[in-house]
Amino acid sequence: MKLLPWIFSVLFALPLYSQAAGGNSVVSVDLPIPAPEWTLPAIENAEGDLSLSDFRGKITYVDFWASWCGPCRLSLPALNALNSQFADDPVQFLAISIDVVEEDAWDFLKRYAVDYPVVIDTEGDIARTFAVDGMPSGYLLDGQGRVREIHIGFKRGDELKLAESIKRLLSDMATSEVDET
């Protein structure tokens, strides 16, 4: 099974999260892990189905959230601000609702608008594949679709850490493009 090594890698990284100094909610992945492919129906800011492969070539932040998640009320507006900050860069934000009832996700989005694509995983299959363990959970992917960081939970200031990580990946991307020429 192709996903088995990926799942074991993520499970290996999660204990590092609990050991992070000062309650830091970010786990850096030293050896980038290819993210599993998925396809889910869009419910906001996109039409039809979206797949991870739609975002290849862009740094992508995949954010798992739910309507019952308290910290998601802070994280989604913060991610909107980052989406605006990086609008001119090859950066994409994507929200994946894990609500079982689609109407719950819609009600939440009416109160906490999101400016980037939102898809829904009512069966929880993709969340299980990513080994999501806590809400919200975010996965920062490089342009090749590899997981570079795992973010678990959200508190004020986490968006600043995420912005720095995105800038670092943008710099790496620019450097690799120069090296290829």
Predicted region positions:
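Bacterial N-terminal signal peptides
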Residues: 6-15
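Short pre-active-site segment immediately N-terminal to redox-active cysteine/selenocysteine motifs
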Residues: 58-60, 64-68, 134
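N-terminal "domain-start" segment that seeds a small globular fold
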Residues: 21-52
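Thiol/disulfide oxidoreductase modules built on the thioredoxin-like
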Residues: 107-115, 122-167
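Non-globular targeting/processing and membrane-anchoring segments
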Residues: 172-181
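Positively charged n-region of N-terminal signal peptides that target proteins for export
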Residues: 1-5
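Conserved redox-active cysteine motifs that mediate thiol-disulfide chemistry
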Residues: 64-81
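Thiol-based oxidoreductase modules, predominantly thioredoxin-like and allied folds used
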Residues: 90-103, 114-123
